Amino acid sequence: DYVGLMNAALLLEDPVLVIEHVDLYTSRGQAPVEDYDYQIELGKAKVVKAGSDLTVLTYMNMVSKSLDAVAEAGVDAEVIDLRWLDRASLDWDTIGESIRKTNAVMIVEQGVQGTSYGTWLSDEIQRRFFDHLDQPVLRVHGREASPSISKVLEQEAIAKTEDIVRALATAKQGFGSN
């Protein structure tokens, strides 16, 4: 996705900020072999894993952690990589389709609660899809600590797979008889 995202960003006439997460530098994935002009569609999220019990909205390095947690928890969750995070390009069609199917949402991000993207996203989801939600929007986020002080504190501050697994267990309680 990175190649496609960067190529799409380079062709936009407006200013673009591409955020590269350091944890993704060592990750492996598929890349276009011969199509060096490959692009992902502007404003299009990617359903990484289909599911019917819960919609997991995430981005960057938390995508793989979310997939690991979903597998570990045994929840039939739909995991969506948002890809484009600006308000104008957010893929509300994909998000809405998934929410109408699952009736439950969890936002997974690495950042801390107060200053996070998920704060705005959660609020907007409740405004747009309130009638389709069977439980409150759940959020997994980092702890209230500055990740720039030391590597040890940084590792303690960021959200982990175990945090996602615990939140998935909470979500399962809201499924009713499932």
Where are these predicted regions, by residue range?
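Internal gly/pro-rich beta-alpha loop/helix module
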Residues: 1-14
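Short, surface-exposed beta-edge/turn micro-motifs
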Residues: 14-15, 53
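Thiamine diphosphate
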Residues: 22-178
